[in-house]
Amino acid sequence: MVSPDRDKWRSTLLAGQLFKAMQMSELDAILALATERQVRRGQIIFQKGDAGSSMMAVLTGRVRVGTNSPEGKELTLDIIDPGEVFGEIALLDGKPRSADATATEDSTLLVLGRREVLPFLMANPDLMFRVLMVVCGRLRQSSVALEDLALFDLPGRLARVVLKLADDYGRKTGDGVRINVRLSQKDLSNLVATSRESVNKQLAVWRAKGVLGMQGSSMILLDRAALEELVGPGRELS
C-alpha cells in the first residue's frame, strides 16, 4: 500500500490525463489499492508476452514503451512521464503484454493490480470511461506512427517527433523553443525506427540550415515552419 506517501503523490497524479478529473476521495481509494515499485535506469519493467496483471503510473522518472521487429530493430511507441499510466490494456483484458516497458531514468511507479482495481473501475463508470479514453489515445498514437512509417521518409518522421517533443516539453527562449527532455540520439532513432547514424546526419543537416540548435545537452527548435513543411498541413502529431 502507498498510504504513507499519499499526500506526496496526489499532485503528480492529478496532473495526468487519467487522474486529473478525479475527486480526492476517488484518488485516495485508488492509492489505497496500489503499491509502489522502484526501478533503476535501464531496468526492464515488463516485456511483450509477459502475463498482464496490472496497470502502472509513473510517479517520478520516465518510462519507454516500445517493441522490437523480427530483425531486432527497436521502435519506441510512447514515452511515459510522471502522472501518466501504461499497461492499461492488460488491466482491462488480463492478456499478455503487447509491448515492452523500460525505465529510461531511475523511477518510482504506482502499481495498480487488476484483481484489486478492476472491481473498483466497474463500480465507477466515469473512471472506467477515462481509462478507455487513455486506450483510445494510445491507439490513435500508434496509428499515426504506423502511417508515418508507411508514408514518410526519415526527415518527415523525425520532424514529426521533434515537433511533438517541442509541444510536450518545450519552453520558449529568446532564440526559439528549448526542448527540456533528456533523450539520446539512440532514443530518437528508436522513435523513428531507423539507425542512430541516420538520425545524426539529419540533425546535422538541420543544424547547418539553422533549423535546430543545441544549448548544452538540450535541443533548440529555431525554425518550426521548416519542420511543419515536412510534416504537412493539419498533420496530427500525437
Language-model segments: residues:
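Short aromatic/basic micro-patch
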Residues: 21, 55, 79, 111, ...
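Residues that scaffold the ATP/ADP-binding catalytic core of kinase and kinase-like folds
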Residues: 66, 88-89, 119-120, 161, ...
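Cyclic-nucleotide recognition modules
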Residues: 78-140, 144
